[in-house]
């Protein structure tokens, strides 16, 4: 619909140039066509007249009147009026929305997919949890947001690569190995001799038991076997990392999250990528030595202070491998790189960007892009749930999936803006009521399936072509409200991709489900008249299709029965 209205407005501008209202050399402005906040202001509004007023040497409202008069007639536009200082409001005819139903039916699974990305490459990194324990609910929020964002970008025509970065080379891995070794030697977290910064969850005992039993972990085709020797710290380290990476992969698979690339921090050192990044920074002239340490002049690139890259003992600070890792993304040809992180990592953003800019390789400012999420509070029975017995210090993603469902967890973790703190109410997520948004949306999809089964049971033969031809009979407010929502879906997908905000899909699906449930309660679908019945079934099937398309972008199932 936006494309149609933009074309009409463009023809109107040409008419004003032809009759002298606008100078002949006036270029069409970059006007917007958008949905007003309230329906009273029409279905769409444009600011075109306000942008053209200066060229016409006219006040915006007067030019708006001239532009409205110059618009060509269209069967899809019922009325055009002017509001405020010169906004032009379009009220669409029912035929415009009825035609949209046909678009949904014809395009099916592809309805809502666009070409904004034009096949360009984007890398989306998310979760990137340290392989030191089970995934917690914060990782779950990162997984839900990142995976849905990747799906939305794919729907907008981007060539998406999903990436998981494993920090498998730091102090935390050493603490993990020491913790598993202590368990393997018979110690507990309360024993004297337990590592000072050791991990205390019950899962450490599970890893130690598997190691001592000589179990083999199949990690993406790479077999790692426990040597049973509690004194062999290096073997324990390899086994523990493989064991926990494998466990995280199983949890992510249950959450319907997968990746194209698993990138190991250790490979950056092994392949010389950290040293390569450091040498590029030195060669660029944006480093200096002081106090035996190597510093990056990151203040030249917006940081609040210069940063140590290499300490006096020769080891690198943690942000150096981060810079090296993102350099590999640039070298791998990503036009865009998007990283989903917890908000507690905010401080690293400027440093990584400064390091990339300092290399003077033509990497754009603001590359990579970041999506930051806030904390999640888990509630049950009105009280906060703080601990998991197995993890020892946090609520795990597996806990939530087992208590509710993967569908509910994905929905609730993505349904609000990432930068807002989130309360996950287990009781609400389990409720089979309209108060539970994922149930409410899924039930709309299942309800259509139920109506189609009922039609078959009653012996009605549904003729979709007949239904499409008879959509004009659906001109009541509730039918048109559903059609309006269906027409919005491609815009919502496009905007969600532009803003990197997949939560907008969830908001939209609730609104579509509400319009559908309202229509269903106010309109008998399986009526005796075949024309009306087929038209209503066609509207229901179109709604079912858009619900399924949107739920797929969120990684949530579209059940046929509930």
Curated annotation (Swiss-Prot):
Entry's Gene Ontology molecular function annotations: arginine-tRNA ligase activity; ATP binding
Entry EC no(s): 6.1.1.19
CDD domains assigned to the protein according to its UniProt record, in alphabetical order: ArgRS_core
Keyword ATP-binding: yes
GO biological process: arginyl-tRNA aminoacylation
SUPFAM superfamilies reported for this sequence: Anticodon-binding domain of a subclass of class I aminoacyl-tRNA synthetases (SSF47323), Arginyl-tRNA synthetase (ArgRS), N-terminal 'additional' domain (SSF55190), Nucleotidylyl transferase (SSF52374)
Ranges spanned by the short sequence motif 'HIGH' region, renumbered to the chain: 129-139
Compartments where located: Cytoplasm
Any Pfam family the entry gives: tRNA-synt_1d
Keyword line: Aminoacyl-tRNA synthetase, ATP-binding, Cytoplasm, Ligase, Nucleotide-binding, Protein biosynthesis
GO cellular component: cytoplasm
Catalytic activity: tRNA(Arg) + L-arginine + ATP = L-arginyl-tRNA(Arg) + AMP + diphosphate
Subunit structure and binding partners: Monomer.
Family: Belongs to the class-I aminoacyl-tRNA synthetase family.
HAMAP family, per database record: Arg_tRNA_synth
Protein name, as recorded: Arginine--tRNA ligase
Higher taxonomy: Bacteria, Pseudomonadati, Pseudomonadota, Gammaproteobacteria, Lysobacterales
